[in-house]
From Swiss-Prot:
Tagged with keyword RNA-binding: no
Pathway it works in: Carbohydrate degradation; pentose phosphate pathway; D-ribose 5-phosphate from D-ribulose 5-phosphate (non-oxidative stage): step 1/1
Name this protein carries in UniProt: Ribose-5-phosphate isomerase A
GO molecular function: ribose-5-phosphate isomerase activity
PANTHER family according to UniProt: RIBOSE-5-PHOSPHATE ISOMERASE
Similarity annotation: Belongs to the ribose 5-phosphate isomerase family.
Binding-site residues for substrate, renumbered to this chain: 27-30, 82-85, 95-98, 122
InterPro entries: NagB/RpiA_transferase-like (IPR037171), Ribose5P_isomerase_typA_subgr (IPR020672), Ribose5P_isomerase_type_A (IPR004788)
Species annotation: Archaeoglobus fulgidus (strain ATCC 49558 / DSM 4304 / JCM 9628 / NBRC 100126 / VC-16)
Gene designation: rpiA
A single GO cellular-component term on record: cytosol
Enzyme Commission code: 5.3.1.6
The protein's role, per its UniProt record: Catalyzes the reversible conversion of ribose-5-phosphate to ribulose 5-phosphate.
SUPFAM superfamilies, A to Z: D-ribose-5-phosphate isomerase (RpiA), lid domain (SSF75445), NagB/RpiA/CoA transferase-like (SSF100950)
Length: 225
């Protein structure tokens, strides 16, 4: 797979990073590309960058690249850089392919500015991929029945490299909920409706109100949306 789109999006996002910044760090392959580029910049320019990672993946990648790890108790992120699995024409996103959507959303909401970086192949007219929902294991059966009443096909995400379900960094299950095409005027409402089900921790819908900008990368360049 050609990764130049991810590289170009990450490279443009790097221009937003200034010495002394506290970064909210999302998760996923594009964020890892960003962190590798950031590591080069830290080494070359002697920058001090602080980071609040949203997953073990980004935690280890940040440490490896010279980012000093801090937390939300003492720090408010100046800028959150994260990826997405789909971005619609209004900049609504679906995230959670890696199961880190709960901490990603917390870090994003705590940040002063949120920038999503994606390969342009993630851009769609309307959201349509299954929505990841983090669920307490105790409530799994109940949540599955309730969420299917909302008109979706729901399935427990199975692990790869292990037997049984995917377990999030928070110790919970992930249920992937296929609502088909999600119309733009339903996105924010659907995000809230899912969260009202007892036992749901969070879901992977990131409505446009949370997003300040999206950077989309192609094989030749990147642009702000």
């Amino acid at each position: 797979m050609d990764s130049s789109g991810k590289y170009n999006a990450a490279k443009l996002a790097l221009e937003l990073v200034k010495d002394g910044m506290v970064l909210g760090i999302g998760s996923g392959s594009t964020v890892e590309v960003f962190l590798n580029l950031l590591g080069d910049k830290i080494r070359e320019e002697g920058l001090e960058i602080y980071g609040i990672p949203s997953s073990y993946q980004s935690y280890f990648a940040a440490i490896r690249n010279g980012v000093e790890i801090v937390d939300l108790v003492e720090f408010e992120p100046d800028l959150c850089i994260d990826g997405a699995d789909q971005v619609d024409a209004k900049l609504n996103c679906i995230k959670g392919g890696g199961g880190a959507m709960t901490r990603e959303k917390i870090v994003a909401k705590a940040s002063r500015k949120v920038v999503i970086i994606v390969d342009e192949s993630k851009l769609v007219e309307k959201l349509s991929m299954p929505v990841p929902v983090e669920v307490l294991p105790f409530a799994y059966g109940w949540v599955l029945r309730e969420i299917e009443k909302m008109g979706c096909k729901a399935r427990l995400r199975e692990g790869k490299g292990k037997i049984g379900p995917v377990i999030t960094d928070n110790g919970n299950f992930v249920v992937d909920c296929d609502f088909g095409v999600i119309e733009e005027d339903r996105v924010e409402g659907l995000e809230g409706e899912i969260k009202l089900i007892s036992g749901v921790v969070e879901n992977g819908i990131f409505s446009k109100e949370l997003i300040d900008a999206v950077i989309a990368g192609s094989s030749r360049s990147a642009r702000f949306l």
